[in-house]
Amino acid sequence: MPFPASFRPFTVYEAEATALRWYEHSLVPGLLQTGGYARAVLSTRPNSTEDEIEELVAARMARQEVLVREDPPSPLLYVLLDEGVLHRPVAMPEVMRDQVTHLVGLSQRHGVTIQVVPYTAGGHSGLLGAFIIAEIGDVPGIVFIEDACGGRVSEDAALVSQAMRNFDDLRSEALQRGVSRDVMEKVAEEWT
């Protein structure tokens, strides 16, 4: 699959996960992206041809099958988005509106929680980088930490534990689910 080498191992864990906890500070998570948004993001890759970008978009969309599978059941998904993610114009306004509207729809699905970490949270640990925690079974066991060079996958218990604490701290700063949905609906309207 056409994923960065640093992320490729995590796609296996993602497919086996019973729960995913995801914090993003700059972009909509790949599992939640629309095709148009993904295309806009992936088009920023230097030296990529249109065919390569379309292959990457198709791979990203295929990953989303994990959210609609029945056997085994889809993982529970807990997503924390920095408010700036909703406002960052990475694509044309209609693409941004469709993307934020898509997030609203996803947030209404069983097993999906999307919460917004508002600007008013000020400085917080999430500003240092995005991360995903995959729980397989009852134990949170694998973390992918993004950085400027791609990222890394780790099963180190201390690192996973720190990521869980960071996630819990960020979640305590996040708006409640209903308020987050209201914010996303308002932002979607602003993109029109």
Stretches with model-predicted labels:
Residues 1-87, 155-158, 165-192:
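Interdomain hinge/linker segments and adjacent boundary elements that couple functional modules
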